[in-house]
Amino acid sequence: MDDYLEAFVREGEEHVTSLNNALLELESDPGNEEAMDEIFRTAHTLKGNFGAMGFEDASDLAHAVEDLLDEMRQGNLEVTSDRMDRIFEGIDGIEACLDEIQATGDVDRDVTGTIESVRAVLDEVDGDGGSGTTTSSGDAGSPAGDGDVDATRVVDADTIDAAEDPVYHIHIDMGDSQMKGVDGMFVLEEATEAFDLLGAEPSPDAINDGEYGDGFELVVATPSDEVSDTVAAFPKLSDATVTAVGDDEHAPDADSGTEADASADDDADDAGTTADSGSSSGGSSAIDNTDTEIQSVRVDVDQLDELHGLVEQLVTTRIKLRRGMEESDREVLDELDELDKITSSLQDTVMDMRLVPMKKIVGKFPRLVRDLAREQDKDIDFVVEGDDVELDRTILTEISDPLMHLLRNAVDHGIEKPAVREDNGKDREGTITLSAERDRDHVLIQVRDDGAGIDHDTMREKAIEKGVKTREEVQDMPDDDVEDLVFHPGFSTNDEVTDVSGRGVGMDVVRDTVTRLDGSVSVDSTPGEGTTFTMTLPVTVAIVKVLFVESGGEEYGIPIKTVDEISRMKSVKSVDGEEVITYDETVYPLVRLGDALNVPDETRNGDGMLVRIRDSERQVAVHCDDVRGQEEVVVKPFEGILSGIPGLSGAAVLGEGDVVTILDVATL
């Protein structure tokens, strides 16, 4: 797929996400004019972009959606859930066309059925509302040459009276323009140069954005008596009607099929493409958005990954250089410190470039929750908080599916039917909240619902039934540990398998994915009140600071962020046959690194070093032979048969090409 097509698909996907979310706002508040304007503008842009790229079937589908939205905007059709279903069906068809273009470069799917389904709703409109003819919100679709023109629809009477030159009302018919924003802009520019433009309906900004039906209205003042001939020479318009305001005699109509010179059209198309994409995507004129667009630059993902790879190599080289210099020539250490500062700044910059706001993946979730709620006859209010919180692009991509699993779980298992909620003294409408917040170098993402919560007794019985735990084990198990069983593979409390969940897949995948990203996930539930799933994730990946420890002559790395204290080996006690140490009256299980990794220890009890891990990670103390220092390293996660090995998370390359294993203390 070439660069232009790739940019087209990317922009189209953004429009679809924007359209879905604005439609959800409109469905919940049919009187929301701002949402309706955004919806109509976006649908129009999609239609024009598809047409400009030659995807006529997709353009026709977007046109059908636009026509239906226009009838709603004019008040000819009421906004109902059933009609919104038809619009969403059209949006899904548009999204499928974009997917096909991305995969094959063309659209081969038959969208006729979807178009007919959308246009069938238009048949409900009296008159010719179902014919598919688009009219503007300003009634621009009706010709202005009927001898009864009211120019005060466009400008006030005082402005007309104050004009020094004769005033004319011009109805511009743009025909079936494929790029209304660009074409309207050219007509408006010509009118502004030729006449004194007193007003326009809709506004000039709206015309530049293509927010009109078949045409628009202009009121101008000019001493010229050749207004019709001047207007007929305007590029891009299909037809025009000129009427002298305050005079019963109409100026002659411009030639009814006047078209600008073809070569001029081609040039204008080429010149206007960038302007249209800039104005339509932002929802206001390109001039208004100039500063913002300059400050926000799209970076090609491949280039970003290449830059990130170079930084990794630079960091690795820095590590090798420092180790070599410390051993041979200390006079260059000052220069090395300067290199440290430079590479650290470069590293921070690249990491910041890789950060992407949560809204990039959250945008598709409101529609998901809405559709699932409709399928299950549930009333759900979906709330998003903190969608401007940023995460590394790789992490954000990886957690998209886990978040979807959690939301599906909240709809299916969490929120009750409206009648059940009412019987339990709750509002008929349930609430699911997706929130994100930054906590130093981590991001906390929560999915909360105010549903039924987890039934601990049911969970215990299911654990026994599936052979996960024995009856004796679950009887002594705290409720927190019982809740944690939801992450066990194949575990589900649903007796009935649904299309949404209940197959026992997904929750274990959520934990596996988050763990692989060096994060954690937990669940907290109160029966009758609701459930909260919390994912704790690092903001960035790859380059981390580690503590180097030695055991049996081998060197290992422990992420510094997991370390709470380093000390000499303390006295060891035995509790139920397990070795433990005591710190501040708290008992910590002892993990001897040599035993855990099956390498020979060079120390005995009472010797060596002790690394106590943060309680938030795991309440444990790790024994090793020696602590060698700390350093930032490039961590490469294990893949293939090495992935998933308890206690190991990846490897790092040090000076002289030495490879050090990075430990996963949570599973050690």
Swiss-Prot record:
Disruption phenotype: Deletion leads to the loss of both chemotactic and phototactic responses.
Residue ranges occupied by any Histidine kinase domain in the UniProt entry: 330-541
Subunit structure: Interacts with CheW1, CheY, and several transducer proteins (HTR-I, HTR-II, BasT, CosT, MpcT, Htr4, Htr6, HtrVIII, Htr16 and Htr17).
Taxonomic path: Archaea, Methanobacteriati, Methanobacteriota, Stenosarchaea group, Halobacteria
Keywords attached to this entry: ATP-binding, Chemotaxis, Kinase, Nucleotide-binding, Phosphoprotein, Transferase, Two-component regulatory system
Pfam families from the UniProt entry: CheW, H-kinase_dim, HATPase_c, Hpt, P2
Gene name of the record: cheA
Protein name (Swiss-Prot/TrEMBL): Chemotaxis protein CheA
Function per UniProt: Involved in the transmission of sensory signals from the chemoreceptors and photoreceptors to the flagellar motors. Autophosphorylates, probably in response to a chemo- or phototactic signal, and transfers its phosphate group to CheY. Could also transfer its phosphate group to CheB.
Low complexity compositional bias, start-end: 133-146, 271-286
Sequence segments annotated as region (Disordered): 123-149, 243-291
NCBIfam families tied to this protein: CheA_Halo
Catalytic activity: ATP + protein L-histidine = ADP + protein N-phospho-L-histidine
Residues the record lists as Phosphohistidine modifications: 44
GO function term, MF aspect, one: phosphorelay sensor kinase activity
Organism of provenance: Halobacterium salinarum (strain ATCC 29341 / DSM 671 / R1)
Domain of life the protein comes from: Archaea
